[in-house]
Amino acid sequence: MELKNHKKIIILGSGPAGYTAAIYSSRANLNPLLITGINKGGQLMNTNEIENWPGDFKKITGPELMNRMHEHSLKFKTEIVYDNIISVEFKKKPFFLLGEYNKYTCDAVIIATGANPRYLGLSSENKFKGKGISTCAVCDGFFYKNKEIAVVGGGNTAIEETLYLSNFVKKIYLIHRRNNFKAEKILIDRLLKIVKTKKVILHLNSTIEDILGNNKGVTHLLIKNKNLKEKKKLKIAVSGLFVAIGYIPNTDIFTDQLKMKDGYIKIKKGTHGNYTQTNIPGVFAAGDVIDHVYRQAITSSASGCMAALDSERYLNSLS
């Protein structure tokens, strides 16, 4: 492996948080190195249309937005490397990162490796991702106006997605593998009010067995009720499926280095700056690796900006 030159700061990840951190770090003359990771561009690369990015009132695709961020970071001379980090050493300085192709050292790190949605694990899911299967109602819900769709999940996220979608879709089939929801009572109460209107149809103790469709996208779901002894499956017609069964942060390689909670990196927070610092000085985190609540492109970008500013202050303190 070739040993790369030492860098003041390395940014891991090429989603909104990573690119924003790169832009701010570059403008601060820190000459950052951004390592893209496996999924260049992050989750937005699977989003067909974005209508809630401030200033872009005309439709823009996820890949288009990420390409613009990529070009923006290059404008300010960010060095971008296509590699995937497989192990790190943060317990001594300089920090050491081992990639699939090269080795890297640096004085500061911003972790923006993102989080991937947890899917059902059906073989038919990959076929319809971006063509009827979504993991973000706020991002894609509007495109199902006056259509019948399904939501799968039983926690806060699933119910929140259902409540949001109920504002403009025709009907929602909410599918949950258990008999009871694992969500806040206030959310369940709101859900049950809508259930009474028959706009939301509950399928409890049920699982999705298969996803059917054509070249245009999803058309039907096959679901099975676990309480029924017969093996017959119910076929329901839907235009889309929103999967809301949780997220998996891309933080496995940091588990023995950083403090975490449920796979998400814990940061300092507070009101006196250094908000994005982890338990190790010089290691900062931004985007979906620290956020299991909002998970929006704009909130990821905001935290990427904060991490860049925090890391700049840290590096200045070393000189």
From Swiss-Prot:
Any GO BP annotation: removal of superoxide radicals
Cofactor stoichiometry and binding remark: Binds 1 FAD per subunit.
Main location: cytoplasm
Reactions listed under catalytic activity: [thioredoxin]-dithiol + NADP(+) = [thioredoxin]-disulfide + NADPH + H(+)
Documented EC number(s): 1.8.1.9
A Gene Ontology molecular function term of the record: thioredoxin-disulfide reductase (NADPH) activity
InterPro entries: FAD/NAD-bd_sf, FAD/NAD-binding_dom, Ferredoxin-NADP_redctase_2, Pyr_nucl-diS_OxRdtase_2_AS, Thioredox_Rdtase
Keywords: Cytoplasm, Disulfide bond, FAD, Flavoprotein, NADP, Oxidoreductase, Redox-active center
Residues reported in the UniProt entry to bind FAD: 36-43, 288-297
Enzyme class, broadest EC rank: oxidoreductase
Cofactor(s) for this UniProt protein: FAD
S-S bridge residues: 136-139
Record's subcellular location: Cytoplasm
GO cellular component, one term: cytoplasm
Note: The active site is a redox-active disulfide bond.
Family, per entry: Belongs to the class-II pyridine nucleotide-disulfide oxidoreductase family.
Quaternary context: Homodimer.
Record's protein name: Thioredoxin reductase
Organism whose genome encodes this protein: Buchnera aphidicola subsp. Schizaphis graminum (strain Sg)
Gene name for this UniProt entry: trxB
